[in-house]
């Protein structure tokens, strides 16, 4: 952590950031939302620049002319140095700065917005602190708990900053088309949805090990309960298998395909009415999340949704046929090929037009052109369904 900042002191500030008074405090500028820099480019600070933070988010924002990356932050020195070099190479200069502590990004007055690509246990706390600092927020999915989703939703509403969840599926043609067909009745009355998500990984327990040079483990843990450093749990994506940091494959992959399902049945701001299920939880292992699972959801309109481990597919079944994508982003199949050819008049179409990528949607939102398509309410509703499962 930054010099002089003890873990206990940091946790006190973290609790304060998520407390009720924080929800009603205006942003520092006193405006309804954060200001945009005079250059007319949205200036960005990146928090978390691991594999997804650079390979997906940083790479995408560097290609948007209206965005400008000013700083990168990561608790791993090698990652932030690599990301800084990536930014400087893209812009042909050496202007990008880097830091270990994300609060240095929030304190930088020339940064309009932050892009958060950290483990899940940091998502909401960083988003809340950024919003209260007057920064617009692009943050990866999901939340860690149901309560966090409520805090996120209320904080963004109170501060007036723009928020975009980092989920791309609503701008992926395959999943947008599935939702469009189902919402417009191409399958008749919807009866059942089948979703298959990856199984959880099982990692054995490890002995405590020396913290590697150039890695701030205390800041990586942040608001999570203290535990000694072991290599695997801090590895890229491997932390997803520990409940202190994530909800496992269910909340990782479910954030994609379960969102498509909820959109298809008009429940993006709703949720299930009944939930039942079972899972297999490893014993005497580092992994604490379910390695195998099967969950039964009931939604309004007598729609059953079954989510189980074992793949990456989604299938809708209705009174007039079925529609599926058998694996991640695979082409659609249907019981009748004519289902795939259905056309809906614009004035009658019950599905919104396909939006730009989540990155462009965020920039458009900050510039006041549109409301970003994945709001705090969306991520709260989706995450709630996953957490309850």
Report residues per predicted region.
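Non-transmembrane alpha-helical segments in soluble domains
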Residues: 11, 84, 103-106, 115, ...
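C-terminal helical cap and adjacent loop that interface with cofactors, partners, or active-site loops
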Residues: 14-17, 55-57, 246-270, 292-294, ...
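N-terminal glycine-/serine-/threonine-rich beta1-alpha1-beta2 phosphate-ribose binding loop
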Residues: 2-139, 144, 150-163
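Rossmann-like dinucleotide-binding domain that binds NAD(P)(H)
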Residues: 218-301
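NAD(P)-dependent dehydrogenases' Rossmann-like dinucleotide-binding region
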Residues: 48, 186-204, 216-230, 273-282, ...
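A contiguous active-site-proximal alpha/beta segment in oxidoreductase catalytic domains
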Residues: 136, 143-219
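Secondary-structure transition/capping motifs at alpha-helix termini
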Residues: 64, 130, 155-161, 184-188, ...
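Tryptophan-centric aromatic hotspots in well-structured domains and transmembrane helices
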Residues: 30, 80, 120-122, 129, ...
């Amino acid at each position: 952590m930054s010099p002089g900042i003890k873990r206990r002191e940091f946790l006190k500030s973290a609790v304060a950031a998520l407390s009720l008074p924080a929800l009603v405090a205006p942003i520092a500028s006193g405006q309804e939302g954060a200001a945009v820099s005079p250059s007319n480019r949205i200036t960005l600070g990146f928090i978390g620049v691991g594999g997804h933070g650079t390979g997906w988010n940083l790479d995408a924002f560097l290609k948007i002319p209206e965005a400008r990356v000013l700083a990168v932050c990561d608790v791993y020195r090698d990652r932030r140095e690599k990301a800084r070099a990536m930014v400087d190479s893209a812009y042909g200069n050496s202007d990008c700065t880097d830091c270990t502590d994300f609060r240095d990004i929030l304190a930088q007055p020339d940064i309009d917005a932050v892009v958060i690509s950290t483990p899940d246990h940091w998502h909401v706390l960083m988003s809340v602190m950024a919003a209260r600092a007057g920064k617009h927020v692009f943050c990866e999915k999901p939340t860690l708990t149901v309560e966090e989703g409520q805090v996120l939703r209320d904080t963004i509403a109170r501060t007036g900053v723009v928020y975009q969840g980092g989920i791309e599926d609503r701008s992926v043609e395959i999943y947008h088309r599935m939702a469009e067909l189902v919402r417009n009745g191409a399958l008749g009355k919807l009866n059942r949805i089948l979703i298959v998500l990856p199984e959880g990984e099982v990692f054995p327990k490890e002995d405590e090990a020396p913290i590697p040079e150039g890695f701030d483990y205390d800041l990586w843990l942040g608001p999570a309960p203290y535990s000694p450093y072991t290599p695997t749990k801090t590895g890229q994506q491997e932390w997803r298998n520990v409940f202190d940091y994530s909800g496992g494959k269910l909340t990782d992959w479910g954030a994609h395909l379960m969102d498509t399902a909820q959109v298809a049945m008009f429940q993006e701001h709703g949720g299930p009415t009944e939930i039942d299920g079972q899972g297999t939880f490893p014993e005497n292992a580092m992994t604490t999340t379910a390695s195998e699972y099967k969950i039964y959801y009931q939604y309004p309109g007598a729609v059953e949704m079954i989510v189980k481990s074992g793949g990456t597919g989604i299938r809708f079944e209705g009174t007039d046929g079925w529609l599926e994508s058998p694996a991640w982003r695979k082409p659609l199949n249907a019981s009748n090929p004519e289902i795939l050819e259905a056309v809906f008049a614009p004035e009658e179409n019950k599905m919104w037009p396909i939006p730009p990528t989540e990155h462009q949607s965020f920039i458009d939102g900050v510039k006041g052109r549109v409301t970003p398509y994945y709001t705090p309410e969306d991520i709260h509703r989706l995450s709630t369904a996953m957490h309850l499962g």
